[in-house]
Amino acid sequence: KCFYIKGDISLDDIKYFRTKGISLVPRVDRNGHINDIFDFSIHKSYLPIDAVLMAGGKGERLRPLTEKTPKPLLKVGSKAIIDYNIESLISYGVKNISVTINYLKEQIEDHFSMPIKGVAVNCVREPMFLGTIGSIKFVDNFNNDTVLVMNSDLFTNINYEDFYAHFKEHNADMSVAAVPYTVSVPYGIFDLEGREIQGLIEKPTYNYYANAGIYLIKRDLLKKIPNDKFYNATDFIELLISENRKVIRFPIAGYWIDIGKHEEFKKAQDLVKHLHF
């Protein structure tokens, strides 16, 4: 039995082909000519998103390692940190990937001078340090209605297909990937009403979700980000909330390390020894 796709492939199509063990699916145009082939032996999925990785920071907390090397190019195991993220996105069928750069930008441009797994990475220079999302205003090659924005110094196995499906299912304007964060208080805590103690909670544990630095955003909303201004993703989240936009969180089920300090860099080095890619 022959399967083929006309136009764009949907998540339902992808799941169907996977359950049937179908690895190759041609896409045909209106004249029946093949213009693409979906290869599920190479890619986990084919997500209709563009991706932008923020790689312009100085990585000051990782000095002296970052004095001559930009943080995204520091190696975890045998690969640069950023390459794990690029290759993961490619495995989900993401073909339009940009990296915004500033500090030691020439090294990153040289690093991506050749395609990775057949995908050309677009390097975009920011003229000044513009925060964790401000430089996206200089990216002008979007093809899809949904844009994934992420920090380039993360070490994670987030499931991008689940992330995107959750975003679409809830018709969100923005989805923020989140990681569980537990705070354990080593003392007894008073339950107070004014000055009076109403009770005692012995060594409580509180569970929260923390911002993981990975976002899915409706492309049209990116125009709200100001030009040539230092602007963080948290500023953008607060703006959308103030406008009563739908901002949701997506819990990451796998591992996640923000490589911002020497301790986290060591954690990633230890973890990668036990992973198989």
Pin down the residues of each PLM region.
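Conserved N-terminal catalytic core of the sugar/cofactor nucleotidyltransferase
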Residues: F3, I42, K79-S152, D162, ...
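Catalytic-core segments of class I nucleotidyltransferases/pyrophosphorylases
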Residues: V147-L148, F155, E161-K168, Y181-S184, ...
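Bateman (tandem CBS) regulatory domains
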Residues: K1-F3, T66-T69
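The conserved cystathionine-beta-synthase
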Residues: F3-S23, R27-R30
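N-terminal nucleotide-binding beta1-loop-alpha1 segment
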Residues: F38-K68, I81
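Active-site metal-binding loops of divalent metal-dependent hydrolases
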Residues: K58, S152-L154
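A short, conserved acidic/glycine-rich loop-to-beta-strand motif
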Residues: H170-P180
